[in-house]
Amino acid sequence: MDTETVLYIVVAILATGLIGVGGFLWRKENNSKGGSFLNNLEWRRAVKHFGKDVVDTKPIEKAIINAPSAFGLQPFKVVVVTDLETKKKLRSVSFEQAQIEECQTLYIFCAIKDIDVRVEQFIDETKNEALRPMIKGFLDNCPDKIAWAKYQTYIALGFGLAAAAEKQIYSCPMEGFLADKYVEILGLNSNMIPCVLLAVGSESKDQKLHPRFRFGEDDLLIRL
């Protein structure tokens, strides 16, 4: 083996090693800056103000659509509001919370009152008649179908929040609004009940975030 060939092999080995080290350092740096799911959750804050820059909300919407729900029924609708004038009207019936108007996109999670209609729609779409007696049996024994549907909206909200954190998009889950006024302003039909909101958008340069606090696992988790 001549000298030139040996040098070529040595250079190739060194290059491969550098690429591997570089990849490791890149992963380490990105994980330390929010590259992992858990780090991104720790990064997340419920912001009170939003900036003017445009963010890509498609990942959030995809997460909401793909969030789990009981039987896969998704007994809710999500109203997506980007129109400024509409957001101003909604702010006036949301105790003047600034996020409503300042956010780029406001997601309004609405429970569906008539669950039976949703079940029929689900069976028609999935062609899975075997699920009908199971779902019907559950709903017939459900003490409060509307409350149950409302619970499902919070699951979808959680996945939307997680997706926003994953993309480091600023967000704020919200209650504190007059649901009947939302129905009126948005022209919703009587089968929809606004339950909870998710405001998303870009960072406000004037944002002042308070230190984050979470109870520790010894307090929050009860292990048996």
Question: Where in this protein do the model-derived segments appear?
Answer:
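Acidic, surface-exposed loops and disordered segments
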Residues: D2-L224
